[in-house]
């Protein structure tokens, strides 16, 4: 008997389609959050009346205002490393599929080897190399848009007193539309917003980069794990020391992001079918049908069928298109 899941009758979207459409869904969640920030900025308690909340992190680490810029630098480096991991996973995928190595810098082999060289740590992570770059990308953006939507609700519900930073003298938003656009374009760094404390948006981005480098970066090189941990710790210190967020903002954000990312497990189908329903009806932004892909070679798939008398029959077939019937048992235990 073959177990049939609720998604077995659904046509799952190609990974490349998911990779593009979930980016657009993230932008939509940023737009919703930008509107929510207008509300939080207006509802924030008057700093002249309500002082910052007691915080052990503030008591342990002295205030160093300029460290707010160091936080941005750390986030930039972490994001760059995450992009590097995804690109190197793509090169590893190509090697695993038996495709030729990319050699765009034939005139300078050293540069070509550094940029387009294949990295493989040899670590047995239980994650297949095939399409790992697309799946990592999809997990990143699906987690990001879910957490930001949740944050848009949370920051509106309860207004916390401003921390001891520039929000003690908050700027007034004179042009809400412009502020929303600046939030969307700069992901918040170029817009006016105070009061969006519970929970930290900076920490969402930082934690996602940590997860990508811890889980997928370790498939490429051992250095990604210690490097990302050091950058994350430095980022958290900078956020607290610059008084950008309360310590609880960081702890709650870290927990929510990690939990969401781990729930959205690594799957050869990409995002869970429930999330694919959000983008499966779109008439634009890449086809809903799997097309012939030069990065794919025919593979043998073993299908185990339970017969009435307890015997087992194993059939092999060549498949150019992946379909999943029932739960993907091989994914249990993967990060």
UniProtKB/Swiss-Prot annotation:
Enzyme Commission no: 2.7.8.-
Keyword Cell membrane: no
InterPro entries: Sphingomyelin_synth-like (IPR045221), Sphingomyelin_synth-like_dom (IPR025749)
Name of the protein described by the UniProt record: Phosphatidylinositol:ceramide inositolphosphotransferase
Membrane topology: Multi-pass membrane protein
Cytoplasmic side: 1-21, 94-98, 161-179, 225-335
Highest taxon above the source species: Eukaryota
Family in the record: Belongs to the sphingomyelin synthase family.
Catalytic site positions: 202, 245, 249
Location of the protein in the cell: Membrane
Intervals, Extracellular compartment: 43-72, 120-139, 201-203
Keywords, comma-separated and alphabetical: Kinase, Lipid metabolism, Membrane, Sphingolipid metabolism, Transferase, Transmembrane, Transmembrane helix
One example GO MF annotation: sphingomyelin synthase activity
Spans through the membrane: 22-42, 73-93, 99-119, 140-160, 180-200, 204-224
One GO term (biological process): ceramide biosynthetic process
Task performed by this protein: Bidirectional lipid inositolphosphotransferase capable of converting phosphatidylinositol (PI) and ceramide to inositol-phosphorylceramide (IPC) and diacylglycerol (DAG) and vice versa. Direction is dependent on the relative concentrations of DAG and ceramide as phosphoinositol acceptors. Essential for viability of the pathogenic bloodstream stage of this human protozoan parasite and, consequently, can be considered as potential drug target.
GO cellular component annotations of the record: endoplasmic reticulum membrane; Golgi membrane; plasma membrane
